Amino acid sequence: KFGLGVDASVIQTPALKFPATQVSSANVNTLDDYEEGTWTPVDSSGAGLIFSLATGYYTKIGNVVTFSATVVYPTTSDTASASFSKPPFANVTEAAASITSNAGSALQGMINSTGVVIYPGGSFANTANADLSGRVLYVSGTYLTST
């Protein structure tokens, strides 16, 4: 239980509940947008790869999107720059994503307008799809959205 406003009204429910559709507020201090969901990451490299496994989860609070995903690359010799789609919210600026993998080398991610682009750790050289052939990626990131 906690108090609200000057009259210290009490909320008796076990949790805060938001409506299914956002009810915008003109007051910037009002939390009026919360959403949790799933999305399926898809190849955005242009190679048309079909991931063996692709699951993604996100939480959006106001204009902040935090996500995690597991992506398993198929066996491929494709040399296009590796990337996959991000959660269903446009980002305002580029942001970094953390990637853990069984790829045998450090990887990093950059969240841009088209998705999550994968780079070798400490470099912005392209990582080819072939470099991730048969590999499992565990990805997490946070970015700002305008919606």
Predicted regions: what they are:
Residues 1-47, 68, 75, 102-104:
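Intrinsic low-complexity, repeat-rich intrinsically disordered segments enriched
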Residues 53-63:
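Acidic, contiguous internal or C-terminal segments within carbohydrate-active enzymes
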Residues 16-18, 31, 39, 58, ...:
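Generic structural hydrophobic/aromatic packing signal, biased to beta-strands
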Residues 50-55, 70-147:
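Extracellular jelly-roll beta-sandwich "head" domains, especially the C-terminal globular C1q domain
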Residues 63-71:
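Short, well-ordered beta-strand segments enriched in hydrophobic/aromatic residues
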Residues 36, 62-64, 134-138:
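A general secondary-structure signal for short beta-strands and their flanking turns/coil
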